[in-house]
Curated annotation (Swiss-Prot):
Subunit structure of this chain's protein: Component of the srb8-11 complex, a regulatory module of the Mediator complex.
Described function: Component of the srb8-11 complex. The srb8-11 complex is a regulatory module of the Mediator complex which is itself dependent transcription. The srb8-11 complex may be involved in the transcriptional repression of a subset of genes regulated by Mediator. It may inhibit the association of the Mediator complex with RNA polymerase II to form the holoenzyme complex. The srb8-11 complex phosphorylates the C-terminal domain (CTD) of the largest subunit of RNA polymerase II.
EC number: 2.7.11.22, 2.7.11.23
Residue span of region Disordered: 377-405
Protein name (record): Serine/threonine-protein kinase SSN3
Entry GO terms, CC: CKM complex; mediator complex; nucleus
SMART domains assigned: S_TKc
Span of domain Protein kinase: 40-350
Family in the record: Belongs to the protein kinase superfamily. CMGC Ser/Thr protein kinase family. CDC2/CDKX subfamily.
Annotated localization: Nucleus
Binding-site positions, ATP: I46, A47, A48, G49, T50, Y51, G52, R53, V54, K71
Amino acid sequence: MSNYRRGVGSYSRMLGGGTNPFAAYTARKAKTKKRVLDKYEIIGYIAAGTYGRVYKARSKDPGDTNQYAIKKFKADKEGEMVHYAGISQSACREVALCAELDNRNITKLVETILEDTCIYMVFEYAEHDLLQIIHYHSHPERKPIPEYTLKSILWQLLNGVSYLHQNWVLHRDLKPANTMVTSDGVLKIGDLGLARLFSNPLQSLYSGDKVVVTIWYRAPELLLGARHYSPAVDLWAVGCIFAELLALRPIFKGEEAKMDNKTNVPFQRNQMQKIIEILGSPQEDDWPSLSKFPEYESLKQMKTFPPNLEAWYQSIGGTNQKGFQLLSRLLEYDPAKRLTANDALLHPYFTEAPKVSQNVFERQEYKYPPRRISCEDSDIKTMTYQGTKRGSQGGDNLHPRKKQK
């Protein structure tokens, strides 16, 4: 034991750490560690969500001309006080998955920076997203998205989803706002905070999740209370996005019934109503497991409708029959019959003219406006440490402070 103590003492003195043999090492690491603002210049604020905030930035390295999106995860708050209970489950999941995924149609994680009590994920920057593109084509007047653009967007989206599923990842939150497009016309699936590996037994949609997927893109099996689910939930969302690109508005725009608490999940009657008004009421002949869902009795109490998807397709000006066939296969009620991402990529819709392109903007005669960036954001002017109130100044400030007059 005495030899052990002498050895530890010698090691400690060698490191200059006194009683803590790793103190000097920790101090050296702290001195050499680059902070976010040491490496990046913040251009402006992009958006906020339940996870935190996203900023547009450029590298301070003169040899790096790229732009980046920096995602800052916020701390848990309780009233006016801020408590740091560690990194959230969503952040851990997104960091772990993004570090492993490598595909042209998945947003690339450049690096992760852990600084004081904040975690920052630095992603490649995309100038556009599908929500912005849809808005451009629907305001102030309706301008349909050209078929070659729409087809290329859909193909690249399916290609990214196929890659996720081949690597046993469910995205679970696909929607236009989470689907980016670079200035070079490359679609990027982003926001993997709700993604799950599906090689393990899956939990219910709400188990362990603070965030609930936007119901407009939620598959019917989830609305009916499915406890376990498959990659087919992502393909339903792709079908909804396809329809929205065609119509320039959500196909199933229901009103969400709010949860009273985490264990009492209400039946989303209005959302289900929007679906059956277009697809018709689901039947056990077409969906054998229908009666096994927890909300089956609630479904039986709803008014019945005949199938109306073809009429809806014609009402929005849809004329391509192969496009309609693909849409109807993505919006199958029975998840077992829904197309997989791989099968969808091989659909005849993509083999007929106009052919898909790796640049969704190819052949376009106009340019979409750049993403709106705000230089005013109260959060980036504040710093919070444990036991302090919001608004105190400190090193968490992502935006250079304005000079005091």
